């Protein structure tokens, strides 16, 4: 099968952009929420459609549209009550031509954060973690001094701590607009305390609790709080109390093993044209993601997880309510583009709000969303990332048809229909410095 490569743009445009290293450090980490304005159609239709169901032909056509837009391979699972759809389109391995399957294992990036947040809230229910207690009370050596007294556990969970992300320091070539660190550190093992040290060494982005800024450092700190209060390795704790409790069979932390166990796709990273042709990063030591983004899972497992979470199987009602108490994330015009709770976010769709998370690591992108009552979910993985290109000014991303195709698929999977699309803008606004925001799926 012939694959359409996303439109190439001069690489000098990316390198000359004043904020390129910030964009690189934020976006390509991919352990990031896909924040974006919900668009007019979302506010016009808040209630679920009566009699909606899974239209398998429309869903498969939606996956084919993502492939036709230039993404090498895309695979997904959708559920509505007892109805299920499993579909895939495209290629898992460009060298062999092996096709993707719906049940492939995949690195799911920041979807890990919901799992970590559930584990923290379980400890809150047991009285071991107070969400409004200072982080310094739990791990004083990791967040010392005044910051340790001001930043609370809740602020870590909802990204209002103001603590800087560690990605740009963990992959230092990004600050020079180069991707060489991605290859240099493919087999590196890095300790959680090192990652935290990178983020904490940077100046605060704002006074704790006064603003919002996505930071993977927050969730590595949460892992260390879990270690402190339980005496257990946090990844093993999450495996026992969250993954096994939810009945997930294909979800695990890989630890230092750079290989994914079981069937999976190759994972191709473009990095906005800096890596041309896109390079396979499916073999990678994911200790740099840890409790912020190292999980391997499948679309089917993610649907099962979010259904179990939102129907109350993993948390008491009080903790679930806390989890869905969200901070309104606004753009420069003051419009709410995302509502971020405790390790889970809400965005608008044509049939009302959906809850979940997304993520991406080198070459692997994921989105998993559910209706608020947990009756309908979808999860999608794709194996080409950062295919977008900056505009001529180097300040924003040009619209890419794959993003629109993924939004259409999202709406079909969750709502049984797609929303009318507003005329495309000349470009998609780029993210603020070191504030990860993926343009796919929700940007309009």
Predicted features and spans:
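Short, surface-exposed loop or secondary-structure junction motifs
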Residues: 146-354
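Catalytic loop of the DD-peptidase/beta-lactamase superfamily, centered on the K-T-G motif
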Residues: 2-3, 36-87, 279-444
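Solvent-exposed coil/turn segments that connect beta secondary-structure elements
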Residues: 81, 92-94, 161-162
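Short, solvent-exposed loop/turn elements at domain surfaces
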Residues: 85-87, 95-98, 165-167, 388-389
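Short active-site loop at a secondary-structure junction
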Residues: 69, 95-155, 206-215, 290
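A generic alpha-helix surface/boundary motif
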Residues: 57, 117-118, 133, 220, ...
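Residue-level preference for non-acidic, small/hydrophobic
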Residues: 63, 82, 113-116, 120, ...
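Secretory targeting and sorting signals
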Residues: 1-42
């Amino acid at each position: 099968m012939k694959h359409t490569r996303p439109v190439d743009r001069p690489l000098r445009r990316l390198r000359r952009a004043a904020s390129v290293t910030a964009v690189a450090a934020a976006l390509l980490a991919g352990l990031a929420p896909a924040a974006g304005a919900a668009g007019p159609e979302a506010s016009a239709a808040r209630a679920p459609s009566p009699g909606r169901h899974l239209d398998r032909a429309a869903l498969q056509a939606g996956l084919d549209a993502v492939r036709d837009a230039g993404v090498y391979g895309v695979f997904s699972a959708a559920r509505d009550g007892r109805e299920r759809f499993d579909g895939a389109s495209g290629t898992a391995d460009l060298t062999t031509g092996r096709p993707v399957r719906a049940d492939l294992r995949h690195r799911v990036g920041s979807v890990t954060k919901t799992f970590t947040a559930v584990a923290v809230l379980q400890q809150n229910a047991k009285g071991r973690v107070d969400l409004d207690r200072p982080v310094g009370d739990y791990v004083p050596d990791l967040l010392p001094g005044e910051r340790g007294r001001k930043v609370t556990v809740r602020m870590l969970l909802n990204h209002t701590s103001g603590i800087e992300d560690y990605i740009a320091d963990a992959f230092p070539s990004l600050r020079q607009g180069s991707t060489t660190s991605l290859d240099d550190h493919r087999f590196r093992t890095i300790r959680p305390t090192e990652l935290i040290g990178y983020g904490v060494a940077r100046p605060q982005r704002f006074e704790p609790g006064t603003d919002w800024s996505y930071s993977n450092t927050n969730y590595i700190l949460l892992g260390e709080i879990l270690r402190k209060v339980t005496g257990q390795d946090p990844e093993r704790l999450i495996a026992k109390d969250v993954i096994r409790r939810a009945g997930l069979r294909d979800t695990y932390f890989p630890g230092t093993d750079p290989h994914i166990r079981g069937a999976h796709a190759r994972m191709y990273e473009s990095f906005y044209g800096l890596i041309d042709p896109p390079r396979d990063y499916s073999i990678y030591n994911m200790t740099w993601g840890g409790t912020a983004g190292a999980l391997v899972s499948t679309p089917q497992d993610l649907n099962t997880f979010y259904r179990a979470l939102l129907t109350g199987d993993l948390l008491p009602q009080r903790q679930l309510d806390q989890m869905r108490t969200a901070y309104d994330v606004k753009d420069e015009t003051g419009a709410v583009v995302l509502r971020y709770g405790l390790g889970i976010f809400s965005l608008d769709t044509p049939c009302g709000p959906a809850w979940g998370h997304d993520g991406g690591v080198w070459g692997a992108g994921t989105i998993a969303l559910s209706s608020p009552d947990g009756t309908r979910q979808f999860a999608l993985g794709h194996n080409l990332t950062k295919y977008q290109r900056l505009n001529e000014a180097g300040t924003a991303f040009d619209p890419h048809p794959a993003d629109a195709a993924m939004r259409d698929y999202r709406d079909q999977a969750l709502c049984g229909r797609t929303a009318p699309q507003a005329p495309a803008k000349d470009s998609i606004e780029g993210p603020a410095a070191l504030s990860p925001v993926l343009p796919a799926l929700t940007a309009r």
